[in-house]
């Protein structure tokens, strides 16, 4: 598809599609719902709307968002959930029993993901690959201890979810402009992977 620059642009353009699909990850976090991109509210009734393995990231919807959640869920033609908690939320607001499905990362085996990965090693020497979404000091301390024991370099993708200034001091390398194929390469070739991420764990 072409590149869409804003909500109005994508809203006008989606008439040319037979279906619009959203899915995986915590796209329906309370903080994401207000943007109306992942809710598919920009898609007209004439276009099919599909949600695959989408996660709410919470067990309950905040009271203030219940009306909005009920509205957008009932507009989506085909719903599925990644977690049991999401399945229950959908049932509560739509009355529908939806299937529990695998995250898309689990739909391919390692050989298929390997075909997508950047072919040549990005980091030549032995390394510990860190992919942290949270800001937990004990995780960083653990990585530093692992470095002492293994003498591996620390390679980390920094500032993924928030700016963490202290992270810049404990890493040896912090590649930027990492593509999905590069990410797979960094995971595949690491001696160790340290992560607090669902997808970091799955790909490891």
Model-derived features: where do they sit?
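Catalytic donor nucleotide-activated moiety binding site of glycosyltransferases and closely related
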Residues: 53-58, 90, 139-179
């Amino acid at each position: 598809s072409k590149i869409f620059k804003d909500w109005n642009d994508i809203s006008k353009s989606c008439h040319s599609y037979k279906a619009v699909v959203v899915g995986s990850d915590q796209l329906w976090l309370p903080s994401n719902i207000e943007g109306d991109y992942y809710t598919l509210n920009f898609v007209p009734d004439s276009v099919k709307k599909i949600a695959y393995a989408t996660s709410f990231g919470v067990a309950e919807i905040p009271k203030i968002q219940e009306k909005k959640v009920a509205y957008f869920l009932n507009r989506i033609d085909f719903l599925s959930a990644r977690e049991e908690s999401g399945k229950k939320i959908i049932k509560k607001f739509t009355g529908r029993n939806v299937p529990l499905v695998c995250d898309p990362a689990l739909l391919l085996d390692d050989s298929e993901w390997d075909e997508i990965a950047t072919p040549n090693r990005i980091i030549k020497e032995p390394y510990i690959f860190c992919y942290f979404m949270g800001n937990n000091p004990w995780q960083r301390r653990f990585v530093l201890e692992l470095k002492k024991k293994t003498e591996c370099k620390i390679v980390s993708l920094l500032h993924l979810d928030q700016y963490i200034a202290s992270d810049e001091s404990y890493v040896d390398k912090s590649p930027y402009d990492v593509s999905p194929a590069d990410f797979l390469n960094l995971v595949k070739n690491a001696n160790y992977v340290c992560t607090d991420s669902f997808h970091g764990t799955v790909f490891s």
